[in-house]
Amino acid sequence: MSKKFLILLFLIPFQLMFAQKSLLKDFPEGYTPEEIGKRIAYRFLTEKHALHVGKWIGYPETFYWSGALRYADGAKDKELMQRLQEKFDFLFTEEKILQPIMNHVDLNMFGSLPLEFYLVTKDLKYRYLGLPYADSQWELPRNVKPHEKEWAEKGYSWQTRLWIDDMYMITIVQTRAYKVTKDKKYIDRAAKEMVMYLDELQRPNGLFYHAPDVPYYWGRGNGWMAAGMAELLQCLPKKHKDRARIMEGYLKMMESLKKYQNPEGLWNQLIDKSDCWTETSGSAMFTFAFIKGVQNGWLDAEAYAPATRKAWMALVPYLNEKNQVGNVCVGTNKKNSKQYYYDRPCRTGDFHGQGPYLWCAAALMEK
């Protein structure tokens, strides 16, 4: 066998891998992440605040904001970055009252946003604002409830609920605190919490019940888990003791999601129910998890790059001429009723969808 032939055999797998990864780079006009990201990010500048119980910046707005920030950073869009920063800086002055209190996963995750601003700007005021939101998730409040104290005594956040939503809310603020400080306590917390949620909630098919007492595979709930694992694996040191367990859970979930991708290329409100409607926010989160998996080599590019491209191409048509994403499930609490999930209203322009679209766009723009 000639030396040239052996070299060719050696190179073929790499050529195939790069060819598959190129599926996430070459998009037709109107579908490029640069175009889609710009449309959705600039719309954010015109939006009013979406307040949690009418008082504080809510988590959907936080994630829309951070998505716009990621896009601006990736696109090197200085105008957008400046305007996003100016909008946020009102929270230090006349809008300070809108800073969330620190008593719930849905509120503490706000801290991830100023920490993201710090990572981009290196302005210490963002660091000082963001870190207490990460720290207070592991600091017992004076009015702690018995079950919250039990979680804390086991080394988990007292805000633990065993809702799959938590695995983005907790993960995002702890990983951002780790990226800012390099203090391993933050990544250790996030990893320990994730392993426990995997052990408690992941089913044999790789998907997750909304909660232990709600045996339904809700799309966006699973989306929070998928995106949370992708975010954590990006930050988790290669030799971390929990990395193998988290990677196992991630790969198991991705395999199941690939199986349940609907003919359109997206996923349903209840993932395993073919008669349920297509839901875009969860679909965008799954797409984000696929993108990161292919880019980082966690997922086989030959198998997953085509599925990822199909998903992105299917997401874009749900963006209307006003740059609002359609078919977004409204905010949803857990309920042990299949019909409850079927009947949830879907909205156009809901921030639950706007943010994850931007995560995808920013991720696809990465070199």
PLM region spans:
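Extended ligand-binding clefts on enzyme/binding-domain cores
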Residues: 164-270, 276-287, 299-333, 337
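Aromatic-lined, polymer-binding surfaces characteristic
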Residues: 54-68, 103-118, 163-167, 171-174, ...
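CBM-like carbohydrate-recognition segments
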Residues: 21-62, 69-81, 90, 94, ...
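Bacterial Sec-dependent N-terminal signal peptides
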Residues: 1-21
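Short coil/turn segments at secondary-structure junctions
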Residues: 24, 28, 154-158, 181, ...
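Extended ligand-binding groove/face enriched in aromatic
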Residues: 81-86, 94-211, 322
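Residue-level signal for well-ordered alpha-helical scaffold segments within enzymatic catalytic domains
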Residues: 8, 67-70, 112, 116, ...
